[in-house]
A protein has these predicted regions:
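N-terminal secretory signal peptides that target proteins for export/translocation
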Residues: 1-20
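A cross-kingdom marker for long, charged
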Residues: 232, 240-313
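N-terminal Sec/ER secretory leader and immediately downstream segment
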Residues: 45-164, 300
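Sec/Tat signal peptide C-region and signal peptidase I cleavage site
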Residues: 39-43
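Second-shell loop/turn segments in exported
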Residues: 54-55, 71-75, 106-113, 122-126, ...
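Outer-membrane beta-barrel domain signature
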Residues: 153, 158-166, 170-172, 177, ...
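Bacterial N-terminal signal peptides
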Residues: 25-37
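Extended amphipathic alpha-helical interaction segments
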Residues: 158-259
Length: 313
């Protein structure tokens, strides 16, 4: 269950300042499996479990979560997320304070998208939310030849979409398939629906955009102060555009990633997603990414505000 395009604050949203419209152009995607980097979260989980009768079982569960995600190639995905974030940082500078960021802004963005820190945030959430989940069906599927093949395809597609030309080609391919009412879209649609990929990512995008607004406001980016209700209205009015863009990215990605798979192989992945264990994994991932993106979005907004106002950080 890999697809998500977490570049920072997600989706396109307009930030109005002094009558100008400053566009933010990142795109949301799906449920990404984060790499489990660093050891502090596991250590904390172990410490929390000490002193209770269930401590040995809790430690085993944490180790199994570690093994599951190590097998999913999460370190590579986290590296791709960092590349996406650095690129998004360049977009923010060009749109909000062109020519005023320079090395200082690059340093800030580099620190925000630190892979060790990102991994710790997600890892902590996953250790908590999957603590009571039976991991055996997940370990069996992702440890199989098909599971490992799917993981490789998902990572390769994410990496390929770092290239704008590849992403444009994937979108064009999707449009042609939609025009032809290609039967493959039904297969991909069942997978997307089973994992609530569009709806959950739309909600996550709105939350991330709101956090970005809050960061801007806290940093003094708005000449006229915006209250929380105004921020919510600004964010919510972009919901239709966010939903359309999310649907396009989701299905472009799925079609690219799973192109070598048969319909039956994708359906078997969908079947796993519909199990209680698959649903638990999906919920855990979205909860983890929600915390991660809220953190990143708020920090980017706060940092950007200093540059918009011409201040050093």
């Amino acid at each position: 269950m890999n697809p998500t395009r977490p570049c920072g604050p997600l989706s396109s949203v307009a930030v109005r300042r002094s009558g100008a419209t400053l566009l933010r152009g990142a795109v949301t995607a799906l449920a990404l499996l984060m790499p489990l980097a660093g050891g502090s979260a596991l250590a904390q989980a172990g410490v929390a479990a000490e002193g209770s009768e269930s401590a040995p079982l809790a430690a085993v569960q944490v180790q199994r979560i570690e093994g599951l995600y190590a097998g999913l190639g999460m370190d590579r995905l986290l590296g791709i997320m960092r590349e996406e974030g650095l690129s998004y940082g360049d977009e923010l500078e060009n749109e909000m304070f062109p020519g005023r960021g320079g090395e200082r802004w690059e340093t800030v963005v580099d620190q925000i998208y630190d892979t060790d820190r990102m991994g710790q945030i997600v890892r902590r959430q996953l250790a908590e939310t999957l603590a009571e989940t039976d991991l055996a069906p997940l370990e069996e599927f992702f440890g199989s030849d098909l599971g490992q093949r799917i993981v490789g395809l998902e990572i390769a597609a994410r990496d390929a979409l770092l290239d704008p030309g590849t992403e444009e080609a994937a979108r064009d391919k999707l449009a042609m398939m939609q025009d032809d009412a290609h039967s493959r879209l039904d297969v991909l649609g069942r997978f997307a629906e089973a994992n609530e990929l569009v709806e959950t990512n739309v909600v996550g995008a709105l939350n991330s955009n709101f956090a970005f607004y809050q960061g801007l406001a806290d940093g003094g980016a708005f000449e006229v102060e915006m209250d929380e209700d105004e921020m919510i209205r600004e964010v919510w009015q972009r919901e239709p555009d966010i939903r359309i863009e999310t649907e396009i990215w989701v299905f472009s990605y799925l079609n690219l990633a799973y192109q070598p798979l048969t319909d039956e192989e994708i359906d078997s992945y969908t079947t796993l997603s519909l199990t209680s264990e698959g649903q638990a994994l999906n919920r855990a991932l979205f909860a983890a990414f929600d915390e991660l993106f809220l953190t990143i979005s708020g920090e980017l907004g706060l940092a950007a505000a200093q540059f918009v106002g011409g201040q050093d950080i």
